[in-house]
């Protein structure tokens, strides 16, 4: 069980809603993933229409919605988008995204921290997408964010956990849930994040862009469960030298 703010989740796999070929594939893939929390870009949905292609299936599935501020270029943009989302969707939950550079989509750490502090004061439950920067993640925690969402690698790049060393530090020092977001390109990447001790992962492109998104969603579901189970079971430490699992002496004496 994973608790974030006022909600408890059975699944530690959170999902995105972009890049699916159609709403039906999206709905089937989300169901196969077992995910209970989905994020969607405010700029991609019509908040005034409950039968919106993205919003309608999510509402019918009774998904927990995590609107995001993708497209915001600064703190002011993000706060404005958050207020619109809260009014239209009746939720205080928000994935805070501020990435002014359209090429690499790197999150702006300064604007993200400024927006997070303001949004928390306004009563939002803020989950900020950010660099895998241990200092920044600690600052976001200190201003009241309900979780932190450091990137594994650039959004949609499928490069996996390029930031592994820094993720380990963030996980070690965090007092709020750590959700690895962005760049997770395969189920093995998700399992690795969970083995490190991440509380959850958020996956979109790797599922939506797969040849069979529904099967891939199930693969991610199993990978996240396996990775978490491995972490909780206590993985053995890595060592430089070999350690035998069978006796190395006495064999000839035994058989002679």
UniProtKB/Swiss-Prot annotation:
Protein location: Cytoplasm
The active site lies at 95
Q: E.C. number, please?
A: 2.8.1.10
State the pathway, as annotated in the record.
Cofactor biosynthesis; thiamine diphosphate biosynthesis
Disulfide bond entries: none
One family name in Pfam for this protein: ThiG
Q: What is its main location?
A: cytoplasm
Give GO MF terms, alphabetically.
thiazole synthase activity
Cellular component GO terms, alphabetically?
2-iminoacetate synthase complex; cytoplasm
Keywords attached to this entry: Cytoplasm, Schiff base, Thiamine biosynthesis, Transferase
Chemical reaction(s) catalysed? [ThiS sulfur-carrier protein]-C-terminal-Gly-aminoethanethioate + 2-iminoacetate + 1-deoxy-D-xylulose 5-phosphate = [ThiS sulfur-carrier protein]-C-terminal Gly-Gly + 2-[(2R,5Z)-2-carboxy-4-methylthiazol-5(2H)-ylidene]ethyl phosphate + 2 H2O + H(+)
GO BP terms: namely: thiamine biosynthetic process; thiamine diphosphate biosynthetic process
Please name the top-level EC class of this enzyme. transferase
* TM annotation in the entry: none
Q: Where does 1-deoxy-D-xylulose 5-phosphate bind?
A: 156, 182-183, 204-205
Q: Write down the HAMAP family for this protein, in alphabetical order.
A: ThiG
Question: What is this protein for, i.e. what is its function?
Answer: Catalyzes the rearrangement of 1-deoxy-D-xylulose 5-phosphate (DXP) to produce the thiazole phosphate moiety of thiamine. Sulfur is provided by the thiocarboxylate moiety of the carrier protein ThiS. In vitro, sulfur can be provided by H(2)S.
How this chain assembles, per its entry, is: Homotetramer. Forms heterodimers with either ThiH or ThiS.
Sequence similarity: Belongs to the ThiG family.
Q: What is this protein called?
A: Thiazole synthase
UniProt source species: Vibrio cholerae serotype O1 (strain ATCC 39315 / El Tor Inaba N16961)
